[in-house]
Amino acid sequence: MNGSQTLVVKLGTSVLTGGSLRLNRAHIVELVRQCAQQHAAGHRIVIVTSGAIAAGREHLGYPELPATIASKQLLAAVGQSRLIQLWEQLFSIYGIHVGQMLLTRADLEDRERFLNARDTMTALLDNRIVPVINENDAVATAEIKVGDNDNLSALAAILAGADKLLLLTDQQGLYTADPRNNPQAELIREVHGIDDALRAIAGDSVSGLGTGGMGTKLQAADVACRAGIDVIIAAGSKPGVVADVIEGKPVGTRFHALETPLENRKRWIFGAPPAGEITVDDGAVDAIMARGSSLLPKGIREVKGDFSRGEVIRIRNLTGRDLAHGVSRYNSDAMRMIAGHHSQEISEILGYEYGPVAVHRDDMIVS
């Protein structure tokens, strides 16, 4: 690709630590050098970094990872400042400033806050500042976490209007099987569509330490590709990997972006972490998947989670398979009350109504 590109580089815990209990500074120095080189060439670079808890554990001398959430958040609070200091220190060698963005799921599932985050990202990039993004582990609980930095990086790529998303890992890419216990495993070079067979392969493989395995990388690739962003999974240890991706050289596993990407609002719907989920019956599945219809309350069998009207929810069939993401017309309490009922009963049950559908087709993205 000619001209300036926007590249999001995601570095997981296994890449930043080399599988040890400490940050691998020599490796981080080399990756910063590669990113700075592309920044100097006119490209826009975004970093999505793990490692706050590892940095905190190293600084405080914890011999192993504590089990309690409070202790992990303590380490994240200590480590986050040291982590951003490290990124600033290393990029400053090349005369580059960084800007920290700490996000939680709440920043991304709310449309207005999502747009505010996008404006911040744009301002940083327009001023030639490298955004350094991480989940706000010091305050994030299970209920407000995105969950892993793979999916966070896909959302960051959407926020940045990126051309490419590079997921650096401790493997060469996505294999047909786990190469560490199957010598017949082969590297998958090109992916033009993510199907159930590929999901099954990724679900059985892991990527070093941290919360993100190959399954979460595949989820991230699905979100980003639907937004028109190419995704590359490659080894962080490969020399010149950042330049290779910018220049379009074959490296790792490349997931090709959809030729007709989703429009901006639907990118948010598909990428936003769901605030809850609903299970629907076979009739609703047929209406959504075969006829392209809205979801009516009659087809809802179960409602999980606590969500507000206007938040993104996941829609699943009776076997638990993901069907779609959509914006809920009713909050979770109201959805439970009207589930299984005909649309004309909504007003009588609730005393009000926001229309006959639970999720409108225009506010829905099929998985």
UniProtKB/Swiss-Prot annotation:
A GO term from the CC aspect: cytosol
S-S bonds: none
Organism: Serratia proteamaculans (strain 568)
InterPro entries, per the entry: AceGlu_kinase-like_sf, Asp/Glu/Uridylate_kinase, G5K_ProB, Glu/AcGlu_kinase, Glu_5kinase, Glu_5kinase/COase_Synthase, Glutamate_5-kinase_CS, PUA
Top-level EC class as recorded in UniProt: transferase
HAMAP family for the chain: ProB (MF_00456)
Protein's cellular compartments: Cytoplasm
Protein name (Swiss-Prot/TrEMBL): Glutamate 5-kinase
Binding, substrate: 50, 137, 149
Gene encoding the protein: proB
